[in-house]
UniProtKB/Swiss-Prot annotation:
This is Cysteine--tRNA ligase. The gene is cysS. Its cofactor is Zn(2+). The lineage of its organism: Bacteria, Pseudomonadati, Pseudomonadota, Alphaproteobacteria, Hyphomicrobiales. Binds 1 zinc ion per subunit. Zn(2+) binds at C33, C221, H246, E250. A motif ('HIGH' region) lies at residues 35-45. Monomer. Its main location: cytoplasm. It is found in: Cytoplasm. GO terms for biological process: cysteinyl-tRNA aminoacylation. ATP binds at K282. Keywords: Aminoacyl-tRNA synthetase, ATP-binding, Cytoplasm, Ligase, Metal-binding, Nucleotide-binding, Protein biosynthesis, Zinc. Gene3D superfamilies: HUPs.
Length: 463
């Protein structure tokens, strides 16, 4: 691992931290559940995207950029999508309306997460491109006695799997009550879940051995992870809310279809998010999308930069609940404003930060160490380069703000005027110009020309 400490990650499957040992160090594989593209992603959705982006970056640093495969899916077949399509595009044929909804939502999702400084995953499969793979797994499950056909549906028989519930660690009856699973007369057991359901003439559907229909939610991720990562892979991630039933049912499907002991060796889950101390919901009036936060004044009466949202998320450990607030965003913004805009060059990330990340992705300690490095970077060029390399690893590399040419010319003129005032020993006027520029976010740096020894002043836009 090239000087890195052992990477320890908390495994929901075992309820303990474990040293990460990839199945194949030349191809480290991670799957994270992506968005269902019926509505713009909200700030709660942003948390797993950011958390697992940091892990992706860390794995690439440790094992090499070409030796990590990160799959994050797009769920583009779902009853919520159908309902949104009918609501938003009542004049279009359903398939066209669905396409209009999913394409617009997926495009917005990509734009949003790019503004949060997230790398693109190695592969981003859509559910609709993997229907054949889903039906193949379902056929296997029927063939080996883990699934059955009833009332036009294919259902997974939860009692057929001796250790069903290994992830949530709860008795089956308790799981069903907690997840409010509907009890249908055609089910063998109340906890049995749908693998395939028939579609009416006005619903999207695909031909299958069980008639024209569409997949259940859980089978989608089993099929896509199998196709791109194999029967067993290294890490599966998502939010706490996905442990049951989604991830539990993924495990059941995949293990029973492929005859494996596990689906993924490590299961990671990020904590819940509240907004100003309350659960986020449309009924509470505190539902905030990523797009709204970045581009409207809906939260705190202003727009917030993507890097502020990213840092605000990383200032809480990924396993802990997070109270998302204006105060938290302001704190993150103040911190970012103190960080220099420097280039990493050939520098390596800071060892203290790497140690923190290797300790179950402790971004809280990592951010604290990064801030200390930023303070040193103001006077130490070597620390500056190391800071930039470390910030880049976290997806927090400060960017120099762009400025209009006309504004730049005006700043140049004021800087030149200040130099004239200094030459004339009119320090009061020179200070006035400096203060005026500082108030507008322009930072001046005085120095000497190496050849002539004359005073020179450079400037940059502060963050």
């Amino acid at each position: 691992m090239g000087g890195m400490p052992e990477l320890k990650l908390y495994n929901t499957l075992t309820r303990e931290e474990t040293v990460f040992a990839p199945i194949d160090p030349d191809n480290v594989r991670m799957y994270v559940c992506g968005p269902t593209v019926y509505d713009f992603a909200h700030i709660g959705n942003a948390r797993p995207v950011i958390v697992f982006d940091v892990l992706f970056r860390l794995l690439r640093h440790v094992y090499g950029e070409d030796h990590v495969t990160y799959a994050r899916n797009i769920t583009d077949v779902d009853d919520k999508i159908n309902a949104r399509a009918l609501r938003d595009h009542p004049g279009l044929p359903l398939n066209q309306a669905i396409r209009a909804v999913t394409e617009r939502t997926e495009t917005q999702f990509h734009a949003d997460v790019a503004e949060l400084g997230c790398l693109e995953p190695s592969v981003e499969p859509r559910a609709t491109d993997n229907i054949v793979e889903m039906t193949e797994i379902i056929e296997k499950l029927i063939g080996n006695g883990h699934a059955y056909v009833a009332a036009g549906e294919v259902l997974f028989d939860t009692k057929s799997m001796a250790d069903y519930g290994q992830l949530s660690k709860r008795p089956l009856d308790e799981q069903q009550a907690g997840a409010r699973i509907a009890v249908d007369a055609h089910k063998k057991n109340s906890g049995d879940f749908v693998l395939w359901k028939l579609s009416s003439h006005n619903e999207p559907g695909w031909e299958s051995p069980w008639g024209r229909g569409r997949p259940g939610w859980h089978i989608e991720c089993s099929a896509m992870s199998k196709r791109y990562l194999g029967d067993v892979f290294d890490i599966h991630g998502g939010g706490l809310d996905l442990i049951f039933p989604h991830h539990e049912n993924e495990i059941a499907q995949s293990r029973c279809a492929h005859g494996t002991e596990v689906m993924a060796n490590i299961w990671m889950h990020n904590g819940f998010l509240q907004v100003e101390g309350r659960k986020m919901s449309k009924s509470e009036g505190n539902f905030v999308t990523i797009h709204d936060l970045l581009h409207t004044q809906i939260f705190g009466g202003r727009k917030w930069p993507g890097e502020v949202l990213r840092l605000a998320m990383l200032m809480t450990h990924y396993r802990e609940p997070i109270d998302f607030s204006i105060k938290r965003l302001e704190e993150a913004e103040r911190l970012l404003a103190k960080w220099p805009a420097t280039e990493p060059g050939d520098a390596e990330p800071d060892e203290t930060v790497l140690n923190a990340l290797a300790d179950n992705l402790n971004t809280v300690a990592a951010v604290q160490a990064l801030h200390a490095l930023a303070q040193a970077a103001h006077t130490d060029p070597a620390a500056g380069a190391r800071f930039a390399a470390t910030a880049a690893l976290l997806g927090l590399l400060p960017k120099k703000a762009e400025i209009d040419e006309a504004v730049a010319a005006a700043v140049d003129a004021l800087v030149a005027m200040r130099l004239e005032m200094l030459k004339a020993k009119n320090f009061a006027e020179a200070d006035k110009i400096r203060d005026e520029l500082t108030a507008k976010g322009i930072q001046l740096k005085d120095g000497k020309d190496a050849a002539t020894g004359e005073r020179v002043t450079t400037w940059e836009v502060k963050r």
